Amino acid sequence: PWENNKNISQKKRAFYQYYATMLEPWDGPAAILFSDGDVMGAVLDRNGLRPSRYYITKDGRMILSSEVGVLECDPENILVKERLRPGKMLLVDTVKGEVVDDEKLKELYASREPYGEWIDRNLVQLSGLKIPNVKVESYTGEQLTRLQKVFGYKYEDVNTMILAMARAGAEPSGAMGTDTPLAVLSSQHPPLFNYFKQRFAQVTNPPIDAIREKVVTSTSVYIGAHGNLLEDKPENCKVLKVHNPILTNTDLLKIKYMNVPGFKVATVSINYYKNTSLEKAIDRVFLEVDRAYKEGANIIILSDRDVDEYHVTIPSLLAVSAVSQYLIRTKKSTA
């Protein structure tokens, strides 16, 4: 992505950074064509997973398709034979009778507003936040073991997965079969996470991850109120940029106690008394989130700390999903 591209101009970098605060990344595979009747354009996903080739002929035609040969064309009539490259755009202006290439097109739009100034004044980096004068929570071996049991970690998970990742910084490789039943068919009580599988657009290649495909992936996350995509203004990029979604205790404290104009952080517990129904517990979380929103919070931390023998926690996957859908349903959030 643009973050790893050292060859783009500062204007384009600021342009991409500005819109990254409002747009979710997309990996494709997709070749998108668009037109308003006067101009026609095409853009390819940044991984280049969908082929897109085009001809420009001497008699003023452009032919673009995922494959060569969809239309018969005399080779002697071909002026340009090219392909749309990963993450690139192409624009045909039929009024002016010209083809606008990726570089010119993006420089044009990147120069419309002072995006660099807007980013400098509004975007907040997690790495730039001060560490609060608060003790960072640590755990004894006994406390850690108890927490692992609470959150469903097995001895095998810790030793074959977590320990290996901590040592190597990557998932361990394995090629053994598994006779573990699907979560929905299991006679045990698997964690809620086990009921869900990653969805991705598979063509002929495996899922893309940020370790093996660093050149085309980013792990940055933007936290805060999303701006209006249809209205360019400085306040749109008033968000907190987190470079990695896996947060340390220090990172969480920096967010919890951040003192930056335009940001207000609230913490809502997702723990509940063990004799309470899960449905009532989620409704109580909705009420607390709603109260925090009305008090001006634009960052909400859902906390499962302080679990004990009398309290259990709503699975974090369920809690985050439920709160997200509640905020969308009540028109307090757009995504």
Predicted regions and their residues:
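Conserved short alpha-helical segments that host acidic/polar catalytic motifs at enzyme active sites
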Residues: P1-E235, T248, K256-N259
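Glycine-rich phosphate/ribose-binding loops and adjacent secondary-structure elements
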Residues: P1-A31, G37-A42, Y54, F263-A335
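Short, surface-exposed, charge-dense and proline/glycine-enriched linear segments
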Residues: Y19-A20, V134, N236-N249, Y326-A335
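Domain-start "cap" segments at the beginnings of catalytic or binding domains
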Residues: D232-T276
